[in-house]
């Protein structure tokens, strides 16, 4: 009797829960980078602007601020890495920022993870204002860049 009651309750709860959630598999897009706006923003074919998730580099194009120290170097690094090249995009839970830019992780054809590489080389830091999939990895990469005096962390 108890077994039947338990099975009935489980079936009822399953129906109430609705359909199972889709797995959070990344959605990949293959695209072409036509230009680099700054160290953490690129423009793709079709004019779409992409803000790299979890990365903040010194500003170079914000009209409200002067060019920040190491901003030109960060922009040049991103330009060398992706401008004029095919890339793959992976999105996270938030797909657009407040400026309408696409939010994405960017990968090169050889598999290099651009967002992580910018932080690893010291061209930017982990931007943790909002939660994201690779947050702990990026925080660790920034710590290592600081400890090894890479890029903007050079003494």
For every predicted segment, state its role:
Residues 1-155:
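Small beta-barrel nucleic-acid-binding modules, primarily SNase/OB-fold domains
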């Amino acid at each position: 009797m108890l077994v039947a009651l338990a099975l009935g309750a489980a079936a009822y709860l399953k129906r109430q829960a609705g359909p199972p959630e889709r797995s959070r598999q990344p959605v990949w897009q293959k695209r072409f980078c036509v230009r680099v706006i700054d160290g953490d923003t690129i423009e793709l074919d079709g004019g779409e602007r992409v803000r790299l998730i979890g990365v903040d580099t010194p500003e170079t194009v914000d009209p409200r601020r002067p060019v920040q120290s190491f901003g030109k170097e960060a922009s040049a690094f991103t330009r060398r890495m992706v401008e004029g090249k095919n890339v793959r995009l992976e999105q996270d839970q938030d797909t657009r920022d407040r400026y309408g830019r696409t939010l994405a992780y960017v990968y090169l054809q050889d598999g290099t993870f651009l967002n992580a590489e910018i932080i690893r080389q010291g061209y930017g830091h982990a931007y943790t204002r909002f939660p994201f999939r690779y947050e702990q990895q990026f925080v660790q990469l920034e710590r290592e860049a600081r400890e090894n005096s890479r890029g903007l962390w050079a003494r």
